[in-house]
């Protein structure tokens, strides 16, 4: 640990990227890159992270569990439906009880308000592993992936095409925080949440970022350095079949990417549905970096875990 310091964060929890400063985000990314090169750093020896899941997961569960093992700690899987919370115990009571047993909580659930209450009522760090509104851990890994390719955020254009969902929300806040240019193109009726857009625009005024919300995908990806998409059907929306027709012009394919820079990179938070939001030709092509991006979930989250746990130790 002689080359990189553990970032000092002015927060107990990470619920959205709004809680972090630009300097804290950059420090986390640099620390994550260090941990990527030094996987077995026992910085959380003996620590226990509770992992509460109300939604299915591959990347979030495996990356957090593997991350805790590599850091010398332990990740404890907790099925939300099998906990007493699933039978009516309050979020507040659950938070207070878990604070006596474990050292931190990661929760992947539906309601963002529940995550906020869990953080408020617990004395240990709480990390948002995904809600219907935000996905900050994914956005941290996305920023790390972009930074590894460019070594800067200034002058970089990220184009997000598709549904203005939780991933889009976190990317808007992330881009605004680091001063990046982000365009979003969605069908009418599927724009990102207006309040979150307002927050991103307010942050952008301070950092020099540029945020644009559009409906034209060609305009959004014009001269883009990175093109990003997500599934058209998020968890819980599987019945909305009419979305397929509406979203078809927003598919990432060889015709659309012609508008981007020739050196563009393709990003996707995964899982992907080939031939829906993206063609196999693009996601499996030479300019796709989706698996490196997925791998960075592990390293970005390890950096976050160490920083939050160490921060709580210093405050206690």
UniProtKB/Swiss-Prot annotation:
Binding-site residues, L-ornithine: 166, 230, 234-235
Keyword Transcription regulation: no
GO CC terms, sorted: cytoplasm
Keyword annotations: Amino-acid biosynthesis, Arginine biosynthesis, Cytoplasm, Transferase
Location of this chain's protein in the cell: Cytoplasm
GO MF terms, alphabetically ordered: amino acid binding; ornithine carbamoyltransferase activity
Domain of life: Bacteria
Swiss-Prot/TrEMBL catalytic activity: carbamoyl phosphate + L-ornithine = L-citrulline + phosphate + H(+)
EC number: 2.1.3.3
GO biological process: arginine biosynthetic process via ornithine; citrulline biosynthetic process; L-arginine biosynthetic process
Cysteine disulfide links: none
Gene3D superfamilies: Aspartate/ornithine carbamoyltransferase
Major localization listed first in the record, in broad terms: cytoplasm
Binding sites annotated in the UniProt record for carbamoyl phosphate: 57-60, 84, 108, 135-138, 269-270, 297
Function according to Swiss-Prot or TrEMBL: Reversibly catalyzes the transfer of the carbamoyl group from carbamoyl phosphate (CP) to the N(epsilon) atom of ornithine (ORN) to produce L-citrulline.
Family the entry assigns: Belongs to the aspartate/ornithine carbamoyltransferase superfamily. OTCase family.
Subunit structure: Homotrimer.
Protein name: Ornithine carbamoyltransferase
Gene: argF
């Amino acid at each position: 640990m002689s080359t990189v310091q553990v970032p000092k964060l002015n927060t107990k929890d990470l619920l959205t990227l709004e809680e972090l400063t630009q300097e804290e985000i950059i420090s986390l990314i640099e620390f994550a890159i260090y941990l990527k090169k030094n996987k077995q750093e026992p910085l959380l020896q003996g620590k226990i992270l509770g992992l509460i899941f109300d939604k299915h997961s591959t990347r979030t569960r495996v990356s957090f569990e593997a991350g805790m093992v590599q850091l010398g700690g332990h990740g404890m899987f907790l099925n939300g439906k099998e906990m007493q919370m699933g039978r009516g115990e309050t979020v507040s009571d659950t938070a207070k009880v878990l604070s006596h047993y474990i050292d931190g909580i990661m929760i992947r659930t539906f309601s963002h308000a529940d995550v906020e209450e869990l953080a408020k009522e617990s004395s240990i760090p709480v990390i948002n592993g995904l809600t219907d509104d935000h996905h900050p851990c994914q956005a941290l890994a996305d920023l790390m992936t972009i930074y590894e390719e460019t070594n800067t955020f200034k002058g970089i254009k990220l184009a997000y095409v598709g549904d203005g969902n939780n991933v889009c929300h976190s990317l808007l806040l992330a881009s605004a925080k680091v001063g990046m240019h982000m365009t979003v193109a969605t069908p009418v009726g599927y724009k990102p949440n207006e309040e979150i857009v307002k927050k991103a625009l307010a942050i952008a005024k301070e950092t020099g970022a540029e945020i644009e919300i559009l409906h034209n995908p060609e305009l959004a990806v014009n001269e883009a350095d990175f093109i990003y998409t997500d599934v058209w059907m998020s968890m819980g929306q599987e019945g909305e079949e009419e979305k397929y027709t509406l979203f078809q012009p927003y598919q990432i394919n060889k015709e659309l990417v012609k508008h981007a820079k020739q050196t563009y990179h393709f990003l996707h938070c995964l899982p992907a549905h080939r031939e829906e939001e993206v063609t196999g030709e693009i996601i499996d092509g030479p300019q796709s970096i989706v698996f490196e991006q997925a791998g960075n979930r592990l390293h970005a989250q390890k950096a976050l875990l160490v920083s939050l746990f160490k921060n709580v130790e210093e405050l206690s």
